[in-house]
Amino acid sequence: STGDLLRDAVAKSTELGLRAKAAMDSGKLVDDATVLGMIRERLRLPDASRGFILDGFPRNIAQAEALQKLLGELRTPLESVVLLNVDLGILFKRLTGRRICQDCGKVFNVHTAPPPEGKHRLIQRPDDKEEVIGKRLEVYEAQTKPLIKYYEAAGLLRIVDADADVDTVFKSIEHAVFKHEIKHEIKH
């Protein structure tokens, strides 16, 4: 995810990581140029030549346009964009139930995939709390949802019904990416 790229760059104190840290420490969002710089660096690594997945980026039309420009510079075509289409009630339950082990970093869900008793020290991420989720959904509606039409017009959008269990959703994503045949109505 782009969040992982940010955290890694900050931990390694790269030039871009230091810029990101300065923004985060002052309570600001990391600017698009810094995030795109991190994506550029990551996509230049040899393993990315076999393909890549961007999770959580782009989040708005301006970022999508900048990403398209970057991919053009790298001569790497964008082949598909997957929308995980999930009922808001299910989404809310998944997010509020998500917990991370403080020791190993493994992700659990207290509702759907709880950890073995007493084996993990779990924490809830601040952005998985109810009040923050509401704000994140407002931002999604205002900024991210317009990307649906943007990528649909480009013929790149693949919609996956993500209400099912993890294994079923994973298989649907594989099918959408490799077969380009899954289409559903958007739920929100």
Where are the predicted features?
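Hydrophobic/aromatic beta-strand patches that form the interior of the parallel beta-sheet core
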Residues: 1, 80-82, 158-160
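NTP-dependent small-molecule kinase module
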Residues: 125-188
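Residue-level detector of short coil/turn "hinge" positions at structural boundaries
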Residues: 30-31, 78, 108, 158
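Residues within well-ordered alpha-helical secondary structure of globular protein domains
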Residues: 41, 97, 172-175
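Proline- and acidic/polar-enriched loop/turn elements at helix boundaries
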Residues: 4, 35-36, 83, 113, ...
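A glycine- and Lys/Arg-enriched "phosphate-lid" helix/loop adjacent to the NTP-binding pocket
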Residues: 22-23, 72-142
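ATP-dependent small-molecule kinase phosphotransfer cores
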Residues: 1-76, 87-93, 100-103, 132
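Conserved beta-strand segments of the P-loop GTPase G domain that flank and frequently precede/overlap
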Residues: 55, 83-85, 161
